[in-house]
């Protein structure tokens, strides 16, 4: 089966199948425009695409996939150093560029212009499922971004698993305003509709009023988006006609979950994944959705929770989540050392995330092992639990909890809070009344904003560097 099976097979020429902002293409127009791009690639093995939120990005990515090239999305906000690293490290042979794209510099490969007015009906052979589809660059805490190599098979396995879990069909209309250089926005949010056959409405910047006006059956968002929608009741109520509200890329705070459920009539559906693994765990459309849980493994995916020595842990015990299955990446490009560090001797991928699994199989992500598992005075404290307790205070708008050095305890619980008229001592006492005493923050720092990346994830390393 073709990776973009519905797009490859359709004869549907009705307007508006794929809409980005106020511009759209029918299925047939998209296929013919992307095929014209594929014709221009002349057998290039790797092609870079400036991944703006635009129809040009959709056509460029699809054109590269039709041609059998590995597509390298370049974040539009990447600085010169990051951009040059991605282009050099990926070995991109061509750069697809839309009108208005900044002029290429010495580090750029030859430019192929993207012209959405061109059409072609040529048929390109379907590449081997094991062939690379995407090279997505992901940043760690140190060093330059690493290119995660994702095969066509892995993407297909992920999307088919999600179609099963979410009852995702051609009758759906998907709306979101996510960046198109990450798994969430590009793989799930663009390639998903092209494989399933559902219509796509990318709203541009993810403002609540744009989500409210989209009239979709499915919505994708990160917690920051959902928090802003929940803060605008009229926008949230406009989503009552939807079928699924999907949240990912970070944990959805329980107060936001509750607010959305009350305003929209829908309990949000959470899922879990990484660039390296794609989505591996998700709540199901026909299953129970509980705040703080991300569901069960997708078909073909296995998970386990292990201790610091790699030993298996029982249900409800907190440890590192490891996964295996058909959605996993092929490795880091040019970095066998980094790739080897993520694999166990028996073939499991080390996510670096701390999790628990309930007796019924529901997964709960506590956070990153490096930043969200706090070891204080012999206790293991999950940062997310303390964050949820802080967010239950009416004066707290945002909260991030980290472990910081303590001369006696090893680490202490330190909270960074964005709030209105709250005091440090008040918040410490509030948490102590709701959680075990050892989980209360020893220090609360009131800040104007929390540092976030393009996907809305709090960058905790920047908090502790400040």
Feature names for model-found ranges:
Residues 156-173, 181-218, 232-233:
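Conserved AMP-binding/adenylation subdomain of ANL enzymes
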Residues 23, 38-81, 380:
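Conserved AMP-binding/adenylate-forming
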Residues 216-221, 230-290, 302:
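Gly/Ser/Thr-rich phosphate-binding loop
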Residues 325, 330-331, 354-439, 449, ...:
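AMP-binding/adenylate-forming catalytic core of the ANL superfamily
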Residues 296-300, 311-342, 362, 381:
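Conserved ATP/PPi-binding loop(s) of AMP-dependent carboxylate-activating enzymes
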């Amino acid at each position: 089966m073709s990776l973009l099976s519905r797009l490859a097979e359709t004869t549907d020429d009705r307007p508006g199948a794929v809409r980005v902002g106020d511009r759209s293409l029918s299925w047939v127009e998209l296929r013919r425009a992307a095929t014209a791009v594929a014709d221009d690639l002349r057998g290039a093995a790797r092609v870079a695409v400036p991944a703006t939120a635009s129809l040009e990005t959709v056509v460029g990515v699809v054109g590269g996939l039709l041609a059998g090239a590995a597509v390298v999305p370049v974040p539009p906000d990447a600085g010169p150093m990051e951009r040059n690293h991605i282009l050099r490290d990926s070995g991109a042979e061509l750069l697809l560029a839309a009108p208005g794209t900044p002029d290429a510099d010495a580090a750029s490969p030859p430019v192929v212009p993207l012209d959405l007015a061109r059409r072609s009906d040529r048929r390109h052979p379907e590449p081997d499922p094991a062939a690379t589809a995407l090279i997505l660059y992901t940043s760690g805490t140190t060093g330059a971004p690493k290119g995660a190599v994702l095969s066509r098979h892995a993407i297909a396995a992920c999307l088919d698993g999600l179609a099963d879990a979410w009852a995702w069909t051609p009758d759906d209309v998907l709306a979101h305003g996510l960046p198109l250089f990450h798994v969430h926005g590009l793989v799930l949010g663009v390639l998903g509709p092209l494989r399933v056959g559902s219509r796509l409405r990318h709203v541009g910047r993810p403002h609540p009023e744009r989500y409210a006006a989209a009239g979709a059956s499915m919505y994708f968002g990160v917690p920051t988006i959902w928090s802003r929608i929940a803060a605008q009741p009229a926008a949230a109520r406009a989503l009552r006609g939807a079928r699924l509200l999907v949240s990912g890329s970070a944990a959805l705070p329980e107060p936001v979950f509750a607010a959305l459920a009350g305003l929209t009539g829908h309990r949000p559906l959470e899922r879990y994944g990484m660039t390296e693994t794609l989505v591996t765990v998700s709540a199901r459309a026909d299953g129970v959705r509980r705040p703080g849980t991300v569901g069960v493994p997708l078909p073909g995916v296995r998970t386990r929770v292990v201790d610091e020595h790699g030993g298996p842990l029982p249900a409800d015990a907190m440890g590192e989540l490891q996964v295996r299955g058909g959605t996993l990446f092929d490795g880091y490009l040019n970095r066998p050392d980094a790739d080897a560090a993520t694999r166990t001797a028996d073939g499991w991928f080390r996510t670096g995330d701390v999790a628990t699994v309930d007796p019924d199989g529901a997964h709960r992500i506590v956070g990153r092992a490096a930043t969200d598992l706090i070891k204080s005075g012999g206790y293991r404290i999950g940062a997310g639990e303390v964050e949820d307790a802080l967010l239950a205070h009416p004066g707290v708008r945002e909260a991030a909890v980290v472990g910081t050095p303590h001369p006696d305890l090893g680490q202490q619980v330190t909270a960074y809070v964005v709030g209105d008229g709250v005091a440090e001592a008040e918040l410490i006492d509030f948490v102590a009344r709701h959680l075990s005493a050892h989980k209360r923050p020893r220090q609360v720092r009131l800040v104007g904003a929390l540092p976030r990346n393009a996907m809305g994830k709090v960058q905790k390393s920047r908090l502790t560097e400040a």
